[in-house]
Amino acid sequence: FPPWL
């Protein structure tokens, strides 16, 4: 998943 989530 994207790291900002």
UniProtKB/Swiss-Prot annotation:
Domain of life: Eukaryota
Keywords: Amidation, Amphibian defense peptide, Secreted
Entry's localization field: Secreted
In-chain residues carrying the UniProt-annotated modification Leucine amide: 5
Gene Ontology cellular component annotations, sorted alphabetically: extracellular region
Keyword Membrane: no
Gene Ontology biological process terms from the UniProt entry: defense response
Major subcellular location class: secreted
Tissues/organs with expression: Expressed by the skin glands.
Similarity-based family: Belongs to the frog skin active peptide (FSAP) family. Tryptophillin subfamily.
Protein name: Tryptophyllin-5.1
Organism: Pithecopus hypochondrialis (Orange-legged leaf frog)
